[in-house]
Amino acid sequence: MSLLKIYWRAMQYLAVERTATITMCVASVLVALVTLAEPVLFGRVIQSISDKGDIFSPLLMWAALGGFNIMAAVFVARGADRLAHRRRLGVMIDSYERLITMPLAWHQKRGTSNALHTLIRATDSLFTLWLEFMRQHLTTVVALATLIPVAMTMDMRMSLVLIVLGVIYVMIGQLVMRKTKDGQAAVEKHHHKLFEHVSDTISNVSVVQSYNRIASETQALRDYAKNLENAQFPVLNWWALASGLNRMASTFSMVVVLVLGAYFVTKGQMRVGDVIAFIGFAQLMIGRLDQISAFINQTVTARAKLEEFFQMEDATADRQEPENVADLNDVKGDIVFDNVTYEFPNSGQGVYDVSFEVKPGQTVAIVGPTGAGKTTLINLLQRVFDPAAGRIMIDGTDTRTVSRRSLRHAIATVFQDAGLFNRSVEDNIRVGRANATHEEVHAAAKAAAAHDFILAKSEGYDTFVGERGSQLSGGERQRLAIARAILKDSPILVLDEATSALDVETEEKVTQAVDELSHNRTTFIIAHRLSTVRSADLVLFMDKGHLVESGSFNELAERGGRFSDLLRAGGLKLEDKQPKQPVVEGSNVMPFPVKGAVA
């Protein structure tokens, strides 16, 4: 994007507060006009002194304009600061809301630290541009646009000096912009790398300390900082050169104005007051051109940050759902995967032609080796990704035709990583349902076998759990996650080995709670331990993205296929605890021929 396009798009964010923005612009224009009038009045004062005429009137007018200029400048500074601060927070909140509504696949591809860094640096750059626009940029443009015509009405020859000065500044600015464009983009990439390293290290500080990586990680940060310096310094050199050239041009112009003015006065072709006015014009123009140079520097520096931010904004805007998209209401829990295929880009992994049906209230256990596609199936159900082929239907409705909000409302998930916020215990449980009463929160905690350990904490339900639940044990974190799902009370439940972090006694309690929770709900269990799938109505054995076997636990156990091999490898007895059950005719599993599948 060109600098003007970047600048124009940045200014468009001010349109939300149109009245305040217009008020600031009008006030800025008045400040610019008053500033331009001051050299003219000062010249008249000097001319009156030289002519021994009336000095009181021009002096009084000059003082009045000066006082008005001070008050207007204070008004603009105060209003611009407040407006820029409000819009920075507003843009940050709006962008944040769009970011957290983006599918998980988008976040996984982009990276959390990258999106966060882009948002923070871009909003800071926008704040600076908005503030400078209302304080200086607009007044500078108005002053320069009116200064030359006013000067030309006084003396064309002296005006040419000012015009040449402006042309020189423009040429220097274009040269520096051309030379620093790629360099500034490289600087921004190095900033991202440095920030990502810091974020990655701090988020894994326990590993850093445990493996004594403090010195090596710090050295890596020094290397990133050195690379950033090496990219930044050439850019800074060009701007330093531009500053020197601009200063040389302005000094030379001032000397020319003085010499020409003195010459024209001695020849009787100009008055002393007019020369003084042109000296004021030259000083005003030099100051404004310096502001233009600083403005170009700011915009060039912000260019890479804002381009990336605008791309992120466009990406999130493109993924926003239409306002009239239908909601998924009154969910019963009948779920069909119909020849569903999805492959991760450039990986060769995914799921392929998966078909099965789950009746309302049934429990489905998904098993298989690592990388088999178990989690991918659940992600497809929740529309983390959309199928490349086939369709997923809930109660006969394609999930792609309903709003993500209503779909997420219908599904409660207990992740293997509990995913707790750095908030109180009650706030973390209340994530399941924000408007739940204290009694409902406590009831959910009791059902998840969490109530007793919560009350044992010094502050009970008001206890802060730390970042990602760092102040709790693994079992405590998992029980809060289960309580959250219980409180959400959704018709579809997803359990990613929800009891894996619990001790035997607690697991028995939580398993009972989970059984109660899954009663009359369609439940998916991503199983890493086969002991958790015995009570499932349907077992899906995944391998390399294909649904290799499907059926009841006992049916697959007796089939002698891959699932049976996995049972034996786990050391479980097939007849232990569960009597043999006959295979029910009219299975709800849709026939699916897979090459190489065990029959």
Curated annotation (Swiss-Prot):
Catalytic reactions of this protein: [(1->2)-beta-D-glucosyl](n)(in) + ATP + H2O = [(1->2)-beta-D-glucosyl](n)(out) + ADP + phosphate + H(+)
GO cellular component: plasma membrane
Keyword Hydrolase (UniProt): no
Its membrane topology: Multi-pass membrane protein
GO MF, one annotated term: ATPase-coupled lipid transmembrane transporter activity
EC number(s) from the headed UniProt entry: 7.5.2.3
Transmembrane stretches, start-end: 22-42, 55-75, 156-176, 248-268, 276-296
Span of domain ABC transporter: 335-569
Location, primary (coarse class): membrane
Localization per record: Cell inner membrane
Entry keywords, A to Z: ATP-binding, Cell inner membrane, Cell membrane, Membrane, Nucleotide-binding, Sugar transport, Translocase, Transmembrane, Transmembrane helix, Transport
InterPro entries named in the record: AAA+_ATPase, ABC1_TM_dom, ABC1_TM_sf, ABC_transporter-like_ATP-bd, ABC_transporter-like_CS, NdvA, P-loop_NTPase, Type_1_exporter
Domain ABC transmembrane type-1: residue ranges: 21-301
Binding residue positions for ATP: G368, P369, T370, G371, A372, G373, K374, T375
Its biological purpose: Involved in beta-(1-->2)glucan export. Its export to the periplasmic space is required to exert its action as a virulence factor. Transmembrane domains (TMD) form a pore in the inner membrane and the ATP-binding domain (NBD) is responsible for energy generation.
Similarity field: Belongs to the ABC transporter superfamily. Beta-(1-->2)glucan exporter (TC 3.A.1.108.1) family.
Database matches in PANTHER family: ATP-BINDING CASSETTE SUB-FAMILY B (PTHR24221), ATP-BINDING CASSETTE SUB-FAMILY B MEMBER 6 (PTHR24221:SF654)
Record's protein name: Beta-(1-->2)glucan export ATP-binding/permease protein NdvA
Taxonomic source organism: Brucella abortus (strain 2308)
